Structures are given as C-alpha cells and as structure tokens.
C-alpha cells in the first residue's frame, strides 16, 4: 500500500486540518490492521486460486470498484494530463511486485514475507535521496535504515541455520524483491507527473495495466488458475479485493484529507506487527526470538523513516 499512501499524501493538503483524535487513531489502526492481514489472506487464497491468476483477478475487480468510486465522486480517470507513460511504468512495476509477492508467499510464511515486503519504505528513502531534490537522508532516516537492515539480517539468519530450506529462503528473497518493486512504483509516482494527479487515477493505472500482465504471466508459468473455491478461499480473496484495496484505501484518503499527512504516515509501522500476529494466530506460524527481534527493528525503522521532521521555532 505504500504507493497508494504516497500518491494520496502527495496531494495538496486542505487548510484547517484537525489534530489526531480518537476517530483518527481508530481509522489508522484499522487501516494498518487490514494491510497486516492482507498477506495472510493472500496466502490462504493461494490454496484455491494460484498466485498470479489471483492477483490478476483481484486487480480487475478492484479496478471496477475504483472506477465506480471515481464516477460517484466525479473524479476524472480518463482526462489527458500527460500521465499516460508514467502510468504505464507504474503499472508495470506494480505487476512485478505481485509477480514476486504471490509466489513468495507460497514458499515462505506470511509473517516472514510481510517483513521483507515492508522493506519498501527503506528502498524509497534510499532512492529518494538520489532521485528527488529536497528529500535527503537525515540522521534519523539513516538510523532507521540501519535498524531495518539489522532486522533483515537477523531474520535471514533463521533461514541460513538449521530451520531453513532453499525453497523457504527463495520465498524470503522473492518477498524482498517485491518490496523493491513496491518502492520503485512509489518513486515513479513521486518523480513524474503522477505526483499531480488524483490518487484514484494513480491506483487505476496500476490495477488496469498490471491485470493483463499478471494474467499473461499466469499463462506463461502454466498456472491452473482456480483450483477450488471453498468458503475460506472465497472470503480471503474478497477480503484482499474489497477491504484492502478499496475500503481501506478510501478510509486512508479521507484520513489524509482530514488530518496532517506527516502524522498519519507514521502509523504505517503497525502493518508488519499486525501481519506477524495474524500469521501466528490464524495460520499457526512460529514466532522465533529472531523473528520477533527483527520485527521490532523493522517497525522501528519504518517509524524513524516516516517520522515528521521537527521544525525550528523562532
């Protein structure tokens, strides 16, 4: 969701924003909880719908929901605004993200996969330092990057020991690659004309462009598509489509239009925490001391990277 977060955050904030209150905290925690559960639901849905076909179908359904939302709110999705080619690029990168995260979750636990997926904010901070004027690495961001790197190394040490297999290590690395492409999508949004269009159109580009690419990839890798559609598989798929892509996104945009964006974005560190808890409670995935410590380091890193700068008062 980091690319949607950034797309919405980049819009000019309205004046008269409210300070963070209980309603904001409930909405923010709800959004982060839904994103944390997303990878768990994707892994469950993988049991009945193969990963790339699932991603393609989800993006088609989500695109229809976003189109209906934009029509209802009077948001132009097809106006000529110079965003076509950057939109194509963001859609391609979005597809690459799913081409790694889906198969990665087949090979590794959801609680570990989300840890590597959430390296995206750190790749963004690093890339922005070199690509985006005025978005340099501060001391706090560097500390955050180092904390996250230490967390990843600690997590990988599990795989390099007796508890890992070549397949599970490959799954971890696939999820790390997904985090890289997630970050690349965000950087394209920040560095091009996509920065100035509505977040709804940004998301629409990603969904519409990626869907046929993912379907072609599913055919190329000879995926079966729909294996079986039990109630758990169907509800998991609908959760990732309706709740995560559509409802949580709409709530997030409302929060960014109502409260200061810098304070809202700090809450994203909760995402991987909820994911590890959900993986343990719902899927019975083990939480080793290394994974727990790695989670805390990555969450701390996300907090430091997104923490608003303190302003000197005169």
Q: Whereabouts are the PLM-identified features?
A:
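Hydrophobic/aromatic residues within transmembrane alpha-helices
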Residues: 45, 54, 58, 104, ...
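Specific alpha-helical transmembrane segments that line the substrate/conduction pathway
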Residues: 53-64, 93-94, 102-140, 178, ...
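Membrane-interface interhelical linkers
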Residues: 1-30, 52, 62-89, 134-143, ...
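C-terminal-most transmembrane helix of multi-pass membrane proteins
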Residues: 2-17, 57-60, 68, 157, ...
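Specific transmembrane alpha-helical segments of multi-pass solute transporters/efflux pumps
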Residues: 34, 38-41, 67-117, 153-154, ...
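Helix-helix packing/entry segments at the starts of transmembrane helices
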Residues: 55-57, 113-119, 188-211, 241-281
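Hydrophobic transmembrane alpha-helices of multi-pass small-molecule transport proteins
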Residues: 66, 88, 94, 119, ...
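Juxtamembrane helix-loop-helix junctions in multi-pass membrane proteins
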Residues: 33-64, 109-112, 181-209, 223, ...
């Amino acid at each position: 969701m980091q690319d949607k977060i950034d797309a919405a955050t980049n819009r000019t904030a309205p004046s008269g924003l409210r300070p963070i209150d209980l309603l904001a905290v409930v909405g923010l925690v709800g959004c982060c909880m839904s994103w944390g559960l997303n990878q768990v639901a994707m892994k469950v849905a993988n049991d009945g719908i193969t990963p790339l076909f699932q991603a393609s179908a989800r993006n088609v359904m989500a695109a229809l929901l976003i189109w209906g939302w934009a029509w209802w709110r009077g948001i132009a999705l097809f106006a000529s605004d110079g965003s076509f080619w950057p939109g194509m690029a963001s859609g391609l990168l979005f597809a690459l993200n799913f081409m790694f995260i889906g198969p990665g979750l087949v090979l590794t636990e959801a609680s570990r996969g989300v840890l590597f997926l959430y390296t995206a904010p750190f790749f963004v901070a690093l890339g922005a330092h070199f690509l985006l004027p005025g978005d340099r690495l501060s001391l706090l961001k560097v500390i955050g990057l180092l904390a996250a790197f230490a967390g990843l190394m600690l997590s990988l040490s599990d795989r390099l020991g007796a508890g890992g297999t070549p397949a599970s290590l490959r799954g971890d690395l696939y999820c790390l690659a997904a985090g890289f492409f997630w970050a690349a999508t965000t950087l394209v949004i920040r560095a091009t004309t996509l920065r100035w269009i509505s977040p709804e159109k940004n998301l629409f580009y990603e969904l519409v462009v990626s869907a046929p690419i993912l379907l072609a990839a599913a055919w190329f890798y000879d995926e079966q598509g729909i294996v079986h559609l039990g109630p758990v598989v169907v509800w998991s798929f609908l959760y990732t489509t309706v709740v995560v892509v559509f409802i949580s996104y709409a709530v997030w945009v409302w929060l960014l239009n109502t409260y200061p964006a810098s304070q809202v974005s700090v809450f994203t560190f909760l995402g991987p925490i909820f994911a590890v808890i959900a993986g343990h409670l719902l899927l019975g995935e083990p939480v080793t001391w290394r994974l727990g410590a790695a989670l805390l380091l990555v969450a701390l890193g996300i907090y430091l990277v997104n923490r608003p700068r303190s302003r000197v008062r005169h």
